Every structure is written in C-alpha cells, then in structure tokens.
C-alpha cells in the first residue's frame, strides 16, 4: 500500500528551508551593512547585503499590500494543490513544500520589516544575476521540480494512450 501523503517529509522540508532562510538573513542583516560585499568564489559568487521591497529585479517595488494578499492566496493554493493534486506523489509534495517554504520565508521578511533580505550575488557567464536568498532558491527549485513532474506525468499519460 502506498502512502497518500508524506506529511512528515513535507513539513520537515518546509521547516528546514524556512529556518535556514531566516537564520541566513538574520546573520546578513546583523553583521553586514547594506551594500557590503565579500567574495566567496572569484568572478562567480559574492555575499552582498541587499534589501528588496519588491519582487525579483525590483519589480513592483513598494507594493507591500499586493505582496501580502498574493502571498496568502498562493500559500492557500499550495495547500489545496498538495491535498487535491499531489496524492501518492512524493516528488510533487516535495516541490510544493519547497514553493510553500520559499513563499513563507519572504512573506515573513515582508511582514516583519517591509522588505526582503537578499545576499546571494552571482555572476553567471558574465551576467550579473539579481541578488537573491534561500527562499528565492527554494521557490526556483520548487518550480523546476513541478515542471519536471508535470512533464513526466504528461509523458506517462501519452505512453498509456499508446498502449
């Protein structure tokens, strides 16, 4: 018999990501001034103290009410999809847990300080990528996993139709 929900695993992932996100942001906010930076891997990775009161690339800067409302809607939708569409699917449940943790991590920042602490500063193939944080990474990985799960599901359905 297969497990319908992997609640323990999902909660563990979400709690770990949120704690790791908040601890790293706290360390940056309390030990570095905004704009301070140090090189970790030359020409690739810096730790740079930055604040963002918008979304990626500063989109919708200062629109906190919008972010509060949309984040609450997203968190509720993720719980709904977890319950309705991720049954028996550990991979999808992990993806949703990562999305939930990422959204919650940045939501906590916005509620407490009105801005998000960003600090991971990368230069990828000469492109100075926008500074981000652990919550952003969790969101990105969650989206990638959901895309993989959906593509895999579509592929499995096509295989069944052929048989």
Swiss-Prot record:
GO terms for biological process: proteolysis. The keyword Transport does not apply. Signal peptide: none annotated. It is a multi-pass membrane protein. It is found in: Cell membrane. It comes from the Bacteria. The active site is at residues 118, 136. Its EC number is 3.4.23.36. GO terms for molecular function: aspartic-type endopeptidase activity. Pathway: Protein modification; lipoprotein biosynthesis (signal peptide cleavage). The keyword Acetylation does not apply. One of its GO terms (cellular component) is plasma membrane. NCBIfam families: lspA. This protein specifically catalyzes the removal of signal peptides from prolipoproteins. Belongs to the peptidase A8 family. This is Lipoprotein signal peptidase. It comes from Staphylococcus aureus (strain MRSA252). The gene is lspA.
């Amino acid at each position: 018999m297969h497990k319908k929900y992997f609640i323990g695993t999902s909660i563990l992932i979400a709690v770990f990501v949120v704690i790791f996100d908040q601890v790293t942001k706290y360390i940056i906010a309390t030990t570095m001034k905004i704009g301070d930076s140090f090189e970790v891997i030359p020409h690739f990775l810096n730790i740079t103290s930055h604040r963002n009161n918008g979304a990626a690339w500063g989109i919708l800067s200062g629109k906190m009410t919008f972010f509060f409302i949309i984040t609450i809607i997203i968190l509720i939708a993720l719980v709904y999809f977890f319950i309705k569409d991720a049954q028996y699917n550990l991979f999808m449940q992990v993806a949703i847990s990562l999305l939930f943790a990422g959204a919650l991590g940045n939501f906590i920042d916005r509620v407490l300080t009105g801005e998000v602490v960003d600090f991971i500063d990368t230069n990828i193939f000469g492109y100075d990528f926008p500074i981000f944080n652990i919550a952003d990474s969790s969101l990105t990985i969650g989206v990638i996993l959901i895309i993989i799960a959906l593509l895999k599901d579509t592929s499995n359905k096509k295989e069944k139709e052929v048989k």
